[in-house]
Amino acid sequence: MLLSLLSMNINYNSITSIKQTLKEKKIAPRKLWGQNYLINENIRQKIIESLDIKENEKIWEIGPGLGAMTDILLKKTNLLTAFEIDLKYSEILNEKFGKLKNFKLIKGDFLKKYPNENKNIDKIFSNLPYNIASKVISKLIEENFLKEMVFTVQKELADRITAKINSKNYSSFTVLVQSHFTVIKIIDIGGNNFYPAPKVKSTTLKLIPKKHNIKDFKEFNKLIRTVFSSRRKKLKNTIINFITNKAILRENFLKEYLDKRPENISVEEFIQISNTLTAYH
């Protein structure tokens, strides 16, 4: 495998070393972009191992920061494309990895930049900035750009993604993600494993694309958003805002769901409801 040749020496396990690098580059971690550095090497290795990178696979990394994960990834992949929004971090990444043939740096917002990139890739990785995690995942699903992904996100969001039917965390986002991916929890990570230490816990999830039979994604997405906007109301009181032909409410296929709240309807049932409603349009 290809080895990374560092032009800068950062000890990613040392808060002192990280602080020194940030001081030299006049960088302060920004909460806006979720800039917290994972300083536990064992956890970093475990996360990368969960990607199960095969030889010749091409990887995207979103928000590499100082490059702790990037350094490991470059030893395992023939091509790593890294998207970094912060220009000062981009400068560090260029200094460290810019001469490597298997490294490509894209400067700017991932959501704006990725549509212009070659999408012939195998997997996506990120310690996603907490404030954009749901946006990134939703956008990739909406664009039907479904790849095997390993994301570290705020535990609160991970709990929504992995939620079971009939639970308080079961939401439209749960249904959106689980309708497109098999979700596997890799590890929970306490705040003490980061610098600066966040007040919240993090969770690493693996998302594996799965086949679905959603006939009209826009209608499906609109349906789940509509009914979960009033999650305590029964379906008969919320679905009326979604359908145009009220006669559909008298159809047998809907009757078993009308007195249920959205949190009591499974992912598969939402797909069935959406597909049937689509057929009536």
Curated annotation (Swiss-Prot):
It is found in: Cytoplasm. InterPro entries: KsgA/Erm (IPR001737), rRNA_Ade_diMease-like_C (IPR023165), rRNA_Ade_Mease_Trfase_CS (IPR020596), rRNA_Ade_methylase_Trfase_N (IPR020598), rRNA_adenine_dimethylase (IPR011530), SAM-dependent_MTases_sf (IPR029063). It comes from the Bacteria. It catalyses: adenosine(1518)/adenosine(1519) in 16S rRNA + 4 S-adenosyl-L-methionine = N(6)-dimethyladenosine(1518)/N(6)-dimethyladenosine(1519) in 16S rRNA + 4 S-adenosyl-L-homocysteine + 4 H(+). The keyword Transferase applies. Keywords: Cytoplasm, Methyltransferase, RNA-binding, rRNA processing, S-adenosyl-L-methionine, Transferase. S-adenosyl-L-methionine binds at N36, L38, G63, E84, D109, N127. Its main location: cytoplasm. One of its GO terms (molecular function) is RNA binding. Specifically dimethylates two adjacent adenosines (A1518 and A1519) in the loop of a conserved hairpin near the 3'-end of 16S rRNA in the 30S particle. May play a critical role in biogenesis of 30S subunits. Belongs to the class I-like SAM-binding methyltransferase superfamily. rRNA adenine N(6)-methyltransferase family. RsmA subfamily. This is Ribosomal RNA small subunit methyltransferase A. It comes from Borreliella afzelii (strain PKo) (Borrelia afzelii). The lineage of its organism: Bacteria, Pseudomonadati, Spirochaetota, Spirochaetia, Spirochaetales. The gene is rsmA.
